[in-house]
A protein has these predicted regions:
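An N-terminal assembly and electron-transfer interface module characteristic of large anaerobic redox
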Residues: 1-176
Length: 176
């Protein structure tokens, strides 16, 4: 299961990639159609697409579902790590994974590179607002070369953002 609302085109692309990896029984919550039949239990594996889904995360765990931990899919690197966490959970080979994601990853890297030059070396400060701050900070530092002055977040759900926290520069000041 994938938790989090995505634009239709992004969800379609994601589902296509997951299918190409060989994953068949994938569903997204919230559902596109009200009458889609899904059940959640001990055989359900899930991953979140946004860091502010703490209550949904906790409910899935309460129902016995197994979380997949990963960076959030922000930028080429974050998205690749997010997809790899899913592939790895289901035993998909690195060779198959690399083949499936090669072209979309290259497009993503080119898109990020087109804006990164204008951001490289600049500093950014995140006021606590939406819980998106930590993965956005990771993306801007790692993929765009920005300096992080401080990263504030109204709440840090470590089960959700620990991978992005680990990838922040060691000197990053974090406030909650």
């Amino acid at each position: 299961a994938v938790l989090g609302a995505l634009p239709d085109i992004v969800q379609d692309q994601m589902m296509r990639l997951l299918e190409q990896l060989g994953l068949k029984n994938v569903f997204v919550l919230p559902q596109v159609k009200f009458d889609d039949d899904v059940s959640i239990g001990k055989n359900t594996h899930f991953i979140c697409v946004q860091p502010f889904l703490g209550a949904s995360y906790e409910e899935m765990v309460r129902r016995g579902a197994k979380p997949i931990s990963a960076n959030f899919p922000f930028g080429a690197e974050g998205t690749t790590k997010w997809l790899w966490a899913i592939a790895e959970r289901f035993g998909i080979s690195k060779a198959k994974f690399d083949t499936v994601v090669a072209a979309p990853k290259l497009r993503a890297e080119q898109a990020v590179a087109a804006v990164a030059d204008g951001l490289r070396g600049k500093s950014v400060f995140f006021f606590p607002d939406s819980q998106l701050e930590i993965p956005l900070a990771r993306f801007l530092a790692a993929e765009c070369g920005m300096e992080l002055t401080e990263v504030g977040s109204p709440f840090i759900h470590k089960s959700l953002v620990h991978a992005d926290l680990e990838d922040l520069p060691a000197t990053t000041q974090i406030s909650e």
